[in-house]
């Protein structure tokens, strides 16, 4: 049993390519550090692809499964994107902290669903609107069902994200979010128990939630707490005079080096926070100019100014 996926099918791998590496951030617990890159055009990372991917999934990020079903039954699926953007604009400006309008908050939603198969309970925009009274510290909350393999178990995955120029700064700032989530873990779980059933309509989804997340009185919930982290950062200057294919090879080599240089640092941060007993799932994506582009992308999305 597992929850239904919400990220739009057949979009992720059209835009993101994963880099293979052998580094580990966890010796004893499940966990991973996965690095991805976008396509390159005319010597630069193709940010337009990130805008398009974000826009194609915006309704699924903003609305619960139950709300999307209401639109579908009413024959109004064609207005979901428009209504999602309307809600985001009412929440605040592009890239405004804590509103659900940050690029990293959307990326952690997408990466956890697509690559971890930890499906959405509440995204950041839902946490900041429908569940605002609970003051969640998370950038999204997902649920990963056991697949029955050795060492696999049900996990409630709390999301954190940061996009900033230096990768080490992004790591540090993401762990500040994680520490806040950990300190309020009981409150976060209480919020899920009080709100999550209203966000689903599918009987199979509800069966999963009632079995593992919000069990009947007298039964215990069946999951561990884990963390999913999205980090965006500056790639650096791509060398001139190279073809785009050559630049993609250079990017792969650089990302392998990034993995080697920062895996041990992430592992130590986990230990410093006293969270060694939790699984961590990191997703890293370089940009040309992270600080500028995260704002530009979200401004284009909120304005509806994205070519699809």
Model-derived features with residue positions:
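Extended, Lys/Arg-enriched charged tracts that mediate electrostatic binding to polyanionic substrates
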Residues: 103-135
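Glycine- and acidic-residue-rich phosphate-binding/metal-coordinating active-site segment common to enzymes
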Residues: 120-121, 128-210
